[in-house]
């Protein structure tokens, strides 16, 4: 699993858990729908920390909480 795959999995699972759509998350996060869609579709391979912070805020959590999940903690980083 790549870094971007792990981020996509985390965002989609949190949307399911919190019962919000990707569109609603974009609104709550203050980012454009196209930016979030690019991430979810794997077009954005390395999202900026600023974007991750906004997404975390949309979920009402910190960046640390957003990135603290088993797949990310077990990920061995390689050049993508």
What are the residue ranges of the model-derived segments?
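The alpha-helix within a helix-turn-helix
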Residues: 15, 26, 56
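Short, charged recognition helix plus adjacent turn
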Residues: 38, 67-80
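DNA major-groove recognition helix of helix-turn-helix/homeodomain DNA-binding modules
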Residues: 50-65
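Conserved hydrophobic/aromatic packing and binding residues within compact polymer-binding modules
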Residues: 11, 25, 36-39, 66
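Recognition helix of helix-turn-helix/homeodomain-like DNA-binding domains
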Residues: 31-46
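A short, Lys/Arg-rich alpha-helix, primarily the initiator
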Residues: 1-21
């Amino acid at each position: 699993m790549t870094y971007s795959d792990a981020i996509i999995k985390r965002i989609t699972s949190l949307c399911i858990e919190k019962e919000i759509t990707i569109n609603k998350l974009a609104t709550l996060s203050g980012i454009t729908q196209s930016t979030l869609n690019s991430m979810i579709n794997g077009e954005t391979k390395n999202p900026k920390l600023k974007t991750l912070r906004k997404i975390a805020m949309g979920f009402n959590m910190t960046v640390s909480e957003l990135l603290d999940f088993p797949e990310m903690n077990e990920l061995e980083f390689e050049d993508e």
